[in-house]
Amino acid sequence: MDPNTVSSFQVDCFLWHVRKRVADQELGDAPFLDRLRRDQKSLRGRGSTLGLDIKTATRAGKQIVERILKEESDEALKMTMASVPASRYLTDMTLEEMSRDWSMLIPKQKVAGPLCIRMDQAIMDKNIILKANFSVIFDRLETLILLRAFTEEGAIVGEISPLPSLPGHTAEDVKNAVGVLIGGLEWNDNTVRVSETLQRFAWRSSNENGRPPLTPKQKREMAGTIRSEV
């Protein structure tokens, strides 16, 4: 096993522990708490994949961080922070919408790279909007936290989420997954639109009808994928 993979996991475990202590003292806002919950699932998945115990990894991560902090001067820390571009966290969904449990009458699940797509194939003839919470950097989508499909009545009928066992994804991964979800929902004569915020930062453009600018080739590929999976 790559030692860098192990040390990265150990540091991530310790930093999660620190953030959890911050949350326990009620010092975290909604985006902070949301990332904390998502990262916990991701760490569990990575730990299972790597065969590493999280508690043991957390202790090892603490030692790594303490060693780095002893070697780091305040001036070097300031320069490092100044050189790192800051990402922003954008929210289409409320914390309640993100944390709400939902069920499917006719469940369908598909893995597209590092993302998991779930949808209820029982939903027909509905107007649906896709909302997402994600981070952006340099005005481009950086990391998808969670995307969900909502009917006009507020019911959740679809979802795209990162796979805990496969951390890391690109904006292109997200766009492809959105295309698959749209194709699956439209297969049952639903009308789907994407939030303006997601269109702006994933596609850097938006349409009045709420559709991202998918190419004809992408549309054919997405529709074909759904038909072959149904």
Swiss-Prot record:
Intracellular or extracellular location(s): Host nucleus; Host cytoplasm
Keyword Cell inner membrane among UniProt keywords: no
Record PTM text: Upon interferon induction, ISGylated via host HERC5; this results in the impairment of NS1 interaction with RNA targets due to its inability to form homodimers and to interact with host EIF2AK2/PKR.
Region feature RNA-binding and homodimerization, mapped onto this chain: 1-73
Compositionally skewed regions (Basic and acidic residues) per UniProt: 218-230
Region ranges (CPSF4-binding): 180-215
GO biological process: symbiont-mediated suppression of host cytoplasmic pattern recognition receptor signaling pathway via inhibition of RIG-I activity; symbiont-mediated suppression of host gene expression; symbiont-mediated suppression of host mRNA processing; symbiont-mediated suppression of host PKR/eIFalpha signaling; symbiont-mediated suppression of host type I interferon-mediated signaling pathway
Short name of any one Pfam family annotated for the protein: Flu_NS1
Motif (Nuclear export signal): 137-146
Residue interval(s) of motif Nuclear localization signal: 34-38
Keyword Zinc-finger applies: no
Disordered: annotated span: 205-230
Region (PABPN1-binding): 223-230
Keyword vocabulary terms for this entry: Eukaryotic host gene expression shutoff by virus, Host cytoplasm, Host gene expression shutoff by virus, Host mRNA suppression by virus, Host nucleus, Host-virus interaction, Inhibition of host innate immune response by virus, Inhibition of host interferon signaling pathway by virus, Inhibition of host PKR by virus, Inhibition of host pre-mRNA processing by virus, Inhibition of host RIG-I by virus, Inhibition of host RLR pathway by virus, Interferon antiviral system evasion, RNA-binding, Ubl conjugation, Viral immunoevasion
Molecular function in Gene Ontology: protein serine/threonine kinase inhibitor activity; RNA binding
Cellular component GO terms held in the UniProt record: host cell cytoplasm; host cell nucleus
Disulfide bonds: none
SUPFAM superfamilies per record: Ns1 effector domain-like, S15/NS1 RNA-binding domain
Quaternary structure note: Homodimer. Interacts with host TRIM25 (via coiled coil); this interaction specifically inhibits TRIM25 multimerization and TRIM25-mediated RIGI CARD ubiquitination. Interacts with human EIF2AK2/PKR, CPSF4, IVNS1ABP and PABPN1.
Family to which this protein belongs: Belongs to the influenza A viruses NS1 family.
HAMAP family, sorted: INFV_NS1
Domain notes: The dsRNA-binding region is required for suppression of RNA silencing.
Function comment: Inhibits post-transcriptional processing of cellular pre-mRNA, by binding and inhibiting two cellular proteins that are required for the 3'-end processing of cellular pre-mRNAs: the 30 kDa cleavage and polyadenylation specificity factor/CPSF4 and the poly(A)-binding protein 2/PABPN1. In turn, unprocessed 3' end pre-mRNAs accumulate in the host nucleus and are no longer exported to the cytoplasm. Cellular protein synthesis is thereby shut off very early after virus infection.
Protein's name in the database: Non-structural protein 1
Organism: Influenza A virus (strain A/Leningrad/1/1954 H1N1)
